[in-house]
Swiss-Prot record:
Organism: Arabidopsis thaliana
PANTHER family noted in UniProt: CALCIUM BINDING PROTEIN
Biased composition, class Low complexity, residue ranges: 35-54
Binding-site residues, Ca(2+) 1: D73, D75, D77, K79, E84
Name of the protein this chain belongs to: Probable calcium-binding protein CML41
């Protein structure tokens, strides 16, 4: 009987979680439009301009991924090594062993050269079934990222201060007011903070 594929350690997912969050926050912030505009076009017929916009959106997303990839690839050789992955973790105050870094890379290293190429990186950032078991994985990684944004661990919420603090660690400098605005956009109950449900909504829109 085939054994179930072992799921990797939570440390190996911090890379995926934090970088996905950085990508989503920055990219969604740029592409966001007023809600009235989005509702007025909800039932509009599909047009050529819609197709062009979709193509441009895909290209922009790819360019954004390239920028994130370059942030990891410190020596510019087109590959992310375990050393470079560890260096990134250190820059955000997280220790990760060389073994754990290599494990994270091996999970999606298609050519088995021990490092992560750009296409492997794109695959990682767009995959939903991380373990190949037919299940859509996501909450585990999102919860890990959510916890990293909590100012008070276990509080169950992300405040503007917590968002600002973590974005600085990720190299995304934002004012307190900007962080308030980002939270307000996804704050369903209007209490000025994000709970996990609202955080998931932000990440999957």
């Amino acid at each position: 009987m085939a054994t179930q594929k072992e799921k990797p350690s939570s440390n190996s997912f911090k890379w995926f979680s934090t970088k996905t969050l950085k990508l989503n926050l920055s990219f969604q912030n740029r592409r966001r439009s007023p809600k009235s505009n989005s509702s007025s076009t909800l039932n509009s017929p599909r047009s050529n301009s819609d197709d062009n916009n979709n193509i441009k959106s895909h290209q922009a997303s790819k360019e954004e991924l390239r920028q994130v990839f370059s942030h990891f690839d410190s020596d510019g050789d087109g590959k992310i090594s375990a050393f470079e992955l560890r260096h990134y973790f250190g820059s955000v105050g997280e220790y990760i062993s060389h073994e754990a870094a290599q494990e994270a890379i091996n999970e999606v290293d298609t050519d088995a050269d021990g490092s992560l190429g750009f296409e492997d990186f794109v695959g990682l950032m767009t995959r939903r079934d991380l373990y190949g078991d037919g299940e859509v994985d996501g909450d585990g990684e999102l919860k890990t990222a959510f916890e990293m944004f909590e100012v008070e661990k276990g509080s169950g919420c992300i405040t503007p201060k917590g968002l600002q603090k973590m974005l600085v660690k990720l190299g995304e400098s934002r004012t307190y007011g900007e962080c308030e605005a980002m939270i307000k956009f996804y704050d369903i109950d209007g209490n000025g903070i994000l709970d996990f449900h609202e955080f998931r909504q932000m990440m999957t829109v």
